[in-house]
């Protein structure tokens, strides 16, 4: 293996022509022979560059609407031949195959085509065949061949050639190896995207093989803890959220910021903007307070009041455009991230004085009922499930107690149930007047979560100068059934008047009897919302 490897002949075939002309011009000025196909060759010629068509090299025209262009021994032999293997060199000479030292290919825009909602046939035609085949061939032979799969790599190659100018030019093995790894990563991601799309098109819920396709968006200082390395990858989805948001100010998002911001925005997106303002404050992926209001500022204050201590250093998510009044409330304490569909200029000006506050806008809210896939890694495998998009319409709620909830209780029950869906199990949510007043999350027993939620409600009453705990007259949501009556009785003792839970316990009759004895209204959803 010669190092650096010479670069005298390049094949360029790209869909994305960003930077192509400048790059190819530089290569040509270094004496590199240019081979190309179709539209790429046309663009190069129009720029005044001398380029040789691949069809001239292969002796075959491009055919079948461009489906067959480069799938030929004259091309793949030039990419795969080992330069220091006498038999390979002899075969090249015998068949007139010229070595190809540089391959520059970016693939048909399959992912973008799917994201744009194209029909089935259009998506099929945007599955690249010749490109991945050449990329894999060049990457396999990176002992001699350099492969580029993205325009962002052009400058790096030219710098590499400059660095090796005193050695006759060419590329080092280390550079070619890095480019080969990137190339295999690109083809793997491309094939994963095709496979995932086809599984969806064929309605295959559990394909025999599954791969995640992602592109590196950010290398982070560290992960969940400082001793952990971390990075953020994008899957190409256009779903509004932290991955697609525009950051207006503040330093780069951390691993924990991204995780918590995603949790916050997914929760607040359950509340349609047309139904009124809503705000969620998140800490460690759990809500510390959630509220609706007549204005965003009012909703924020109600969410903040639920747990003023935990809100410090939290994530704030809004379901409507951030305005100045709400911004003024938010900057009263330290907040890590604010995410909203949009922000007006007055709000941005207020935030500008808080350099460490990160502001993200998404351009809209995600559809909380849109199907998605959720992944969880375990040792030796990957758990895959549908994202929890479950919801219960009011007419499907089953009243199981003697007393039915009032209209206000029912509205609060539905609100609390939505918050419980986004709270780590075991989850107990106290709510009143469209706002949480006590949240118990992540406890190993449901009665402990109920007790903690009641204690937090009592603390809220003290901090807000209330005459009594806001748990009095509140409603309670439980993400799973009460296995015993103790958790429900704890809620009743705290002053709750109505309960929403899935039902389904062997002791439902005992729990219902306890609710009736306490004068509670209780409804069953028939749906559980465990969250781990």
Curated annotation (Swiss-Prot):
<dbReference type="InterPro" id="IPR002695">
    <property type="entry name" value="PurH-like"/>
</dbReference>
<dbReference type="InterPro" id="IPR024051">
    <property type="entry name" value="AICAR_Tfase_dup_dom_sf"/>
</dbReference>
<dbReference type="GO" id="GO:0006189">
    <property type="term" value="P:'de novo' IMP biosynthetic process"/>
</dbReference>
<comment type="pathway">
    <text>Purine metabolism; IMP biosynthesis via de novo pathway; 5-formamido-1-(5-phospho-D-ribosyl)imidazole-4-carboxamide from 5-amino-1-(5-phospho-D-ribosyl)imidazole-4-carboxamide (10-formyl THF route): step 1/1.</text>
</comment>
<feature type="domain" description="MGS-like">
    <location>
        <begin position="1"/>
        <end position="149"/>
    </location>
</feature>
<keyword id="KW-0658">Purine biosynthesis</keyword>
<dbReference type="GO" id="GO:0004643">
    <property type="term" value="F:phosphoribosylaminoimidazolecarboxamide formyltransferase activity"/>
</dbReference>
<dbReference type="GO" id="GO:0005829">
    <property type="term" value="C:cytosol"/>
</dbReference>
<keyword id="KW-0808">Transferase</keyword>
<keyword id="KW-0378">Hydrolase</keyword>
<dbReference type="Pfam" id="PF01808">
    <property type="entry name" value="AICARFT_IMPCHas"/>
</dbReference>
<dbReference type="GO" id="GO:0003937">
    <property type="term" value="F:IMP cyclohydrolase activity"/>
</dbReference>
<dbReference type="InterPro" id="IPR011607">
    <property type="entry name" value="MGS-like_dom"/>
</dbReference>
<comment type="similarity">
    <text>Belongs to the PurH family.</text>
</comment>
<keyword id="KW-0511">Multifunctional enzyme</keyword>
<dbReference type="Pfam" id="PF02142">
    <property type="entry name" value="MGS"/>
</dbReference>
<dbReference type="InterPro" id="IPR016193">
    <property type="entry name" value="Cytidine_deaminase-like"/>
</dbReference>
<comment type="pathway">
    <text>Purine metabolism; IMP biosynthesis via de novo pathway; IMP from 5-formamido-1-(5-phospho-D-ribosyl)imidazole-4-carboxamide: step 1/1.</text>
</comment>
<protein>
    <recommendedName>
        <fullName>Bifunctional purine biosynthesis protein PurH</fullName>
        <ecNumber>2.1.2.3</ecNumber>
        <ecNumber>3.5.4.10</ecNumber>
    </recommendedName>
</protein>
<dbReference type="InterPro" id="IPR036914">
    <property type="entry name" value="MGS-like_dom_sf"/>
</dbReference>
């Amino acid at each position: 293996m010669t190092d650096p490897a010479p670069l005298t002949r390049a094949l360029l075939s790209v869909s994305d022509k960003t930077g192509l002309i400048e790059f190819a011009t530089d290569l040509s000025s270094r004496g590199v022979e240019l081979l190309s196909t179709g539209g790429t060759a046309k663009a190069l010629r129009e720029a005044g560059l001398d380029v040789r068509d691949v069809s001239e090299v292969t002796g075959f025209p491009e055919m079948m609407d461009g489906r067959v262009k480069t799938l030929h021994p004259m091309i793949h032999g030039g990419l795969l031949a080992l330069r220091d293997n006498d038999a390979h060199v002899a075969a090249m000479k015998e068949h007139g195959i010229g070595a190809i030292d540089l391959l520059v290919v970016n693939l048909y825009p399959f992912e973008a085509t799917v994201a744009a909602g194209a029909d089935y046939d259009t998506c099929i035609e945007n599955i690249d065949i010749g490109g991945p085949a050449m990329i894999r061939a060049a990457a396999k032979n990176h002992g001699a061949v350099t492969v580029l799969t993205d325009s962002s790599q052009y400058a790096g190659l030219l710098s590499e050639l400059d660095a090796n100018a005193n050695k006759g030019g060419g590329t080092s093995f280390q550079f070619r190896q890095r480019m080969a790894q990137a190339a295999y990563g690109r083809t793997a991601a491309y094939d994963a995207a095709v496979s995932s799309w086809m599984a969806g098109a064929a309605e295959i819920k559990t394909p025999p093989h599954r791969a995640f396709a992602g592109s590196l968006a950010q290398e982070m200082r560290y992960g969940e803890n400082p001793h952990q390395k971390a990075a953020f990858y994008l899957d190409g989805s256009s779903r509004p959220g932290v991955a697609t948001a525009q950051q207006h100010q503040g330093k780069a998002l951390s691993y924990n910021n991204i995780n918590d911001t995603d949790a916050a925005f997914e929760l607040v997106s359950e509340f349609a903007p047309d139904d009124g303002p809503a705000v969620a404050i998140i800490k460690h992926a759990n809500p510390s307070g959630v509220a609706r209001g007549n204005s965003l500022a009012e909703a924020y204050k109600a969410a903040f009041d639920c747990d003023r201590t935990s809100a410090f250093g939290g994530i704030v998510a809004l379901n409507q455009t951030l305005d100045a009044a709400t911004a003024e409330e938010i900057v009263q304490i330290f907040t890590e991230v604010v995410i909203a569909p949009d922000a007006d200029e007055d709000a941005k000006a207020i935030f500008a004085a808080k350099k460490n506050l990160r502001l993200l806008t998404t351009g809209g809210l995600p559809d909380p009922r849109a199907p998605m896939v959720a992944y969880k890694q375990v040792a030796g495998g990957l758990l895959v499930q549908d994202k929890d998009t479950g919801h219960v319409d009011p007419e499907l709620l089953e009243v199981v107690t003697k007393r039915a909830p009032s209209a206000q209780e029912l509205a609060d029950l539905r609100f609390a149930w939505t918050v419980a869906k986004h709270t780590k199990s075991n989850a107990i949510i106290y709510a009143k007047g469209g706002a949480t007043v006590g949240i118990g999350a992540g406890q190993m027993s449901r009665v402990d979560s109920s007790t903690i939620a009641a204690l937090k409600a009592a603390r809220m009453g003290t901090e807000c100068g209330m005459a009594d705990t806001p748990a009095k007259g509140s409603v309670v949501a439980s993400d799973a059934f009460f296995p015993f009556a103790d958790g429900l009785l704890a809620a009743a003792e705290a002053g709750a008047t109505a309960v929403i839970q899935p039902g389904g316990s062997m002791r439902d009759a005992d729990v219902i009897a306890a609710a009736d004895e306490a004068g509670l209204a209780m409804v069953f959803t028939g749906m559980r919302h465990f969250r781990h």
